[in-house]
């Protein structure tokens, strides 16, 4: 039987703007990716942010766990759980790499075109809500 793959996405804020990375197709997303075997949500989030955005981060809490087929398009053929993780930036800077061509911080009102397979504008808005909350409760499907 099929079991879900797990994806982690990092929410990193600076001056009330969220960090997004632009991929080779021109679309933007929260830094993140598939959780590899032997990785945890915590360790994978750190790894993916370092690879895609050049930053070292400290994951602080899980914002949400979403079922991809309910919220993202197009849906995958297999089940996917998407985790959104609030992270504190520690150090580092962006370097172009094989996965991403640039990174930038965006206000909620100025979000660029998104790769909605990875995250939707509504999911980014949820990250802003968590950022503004002093007592966030993890949301899950």
Where are these regions (language model features)?
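Aromatic-lined ligand-binding clefts that engage carbohydrates, nucleic acids, or primary amines
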Residues: 132
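Conserved Nudix-box catalytic region and its N-terminal flanking loop in Nudix hydrolases
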Residues: 13-51
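Unchanged
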Residues: 35-61, 67-127, 135-141
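Acidic, metal-coordinating catalytic segment for phosphate/diphosphate chemistry
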Residues: 1-9, 15
């Amino acid at each position: 039987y099929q079991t879900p793959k797990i994806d982690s996405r990092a929410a990193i804020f600076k001056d009330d703007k969220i960090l997004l990375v632009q991929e080779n197709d021109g679309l933007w997303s929260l830094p993140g990716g598939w959780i590899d075997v032997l990785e945890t949500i915590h360790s994978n989030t750190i790894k993916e942010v370092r690879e895609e955005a050049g930053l070292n981060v400290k994951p602080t809490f899980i914002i949400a766990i979403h079922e991809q087929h309910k919220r993202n398009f197009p849906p995958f053929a297999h089940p996917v759980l998407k985790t959104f993780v609030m992270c504190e930036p520690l150090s580092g800077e962006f370097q172009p790499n094989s996965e991403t061509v640039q990174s930038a911080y965006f206000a909620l009102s100025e979000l660029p075109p998104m790769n909605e397979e990875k995250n939707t504008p509504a999911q980014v808005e949820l990250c802003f809500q968590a950022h503004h909350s002093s007592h966030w409760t993890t949301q899950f499907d």
